[in-house]
Regions:
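GNAT-family acyltransferases
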Residues: 1-120, 137
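Conserved acetyl-CoA-binding loop-helix of GNAT-fold acetyltransferases
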Residues: 115-116, 122-140
Length: 140
């Protein structure tokens, strides 16, 4: 894998692009403030759009890094930012962990997807569509 960072990806129904601080109102309304949606995330539900904007501003600083992958999921038909999808390194180089799986090249760690979408978009195939596109991007 040649790390290229978060680049725009299009699918028939989605635009996957970088999250921006201006996305805070939609992110807050569509998923970041919902305890059911954020239940298994690494952060608690947001209490205000300002909290969401602060998180997005911090994430924006990471986009110049070529191994940072965090996309907004935008529904093309409506322009709504309704979720996010990312790739993250869950084993970023601990030498002792790399030897636990003999025969596997774990030089670059272990990369895993993460995703979160607003309830209104559940069970409509959006996450599957986004994940397929991200996996295709990852392996090209």
């Amino acid at each position: 894998m040649r790390h290229a960072g978060t680049q725009d990806i299009e699918t028939p129904r989605l635009l996957l692009r970088r999250l921006l601080p201006e996305d805070a109102p939609q992110m807050y309304a569509n998923w970041a403030s919902d305890p059911e949606v954020t239940r298994y995330l690494r952060w608690e539900p947001h209490k205000s759009p300002a909290e969401t904007r602060e998180l997005l501003a911090a994430w924006a600083l990471l986009y110049p890094n070529p191994d940072y992958y965090q996309w907004a999921m935008v529904e093309k038909a409506t322009g709504q930012v309704f979720g996010s999808i990312s790739l993250y390194n869950s084993l970023p180089g601990e030498p002792q962990q790399k030897t636990e799986w003999p025969g596997l090249d774990l030089t670059d760690g272990v990369w895993e997807p993460g995703y979160c979408i607003g309830r209104k978009w559940w069970n409509k195939g959006f996450t599957t569509e986004a994940l397929r596109a991200v996996v295709a991007y990852w392996f090209t």
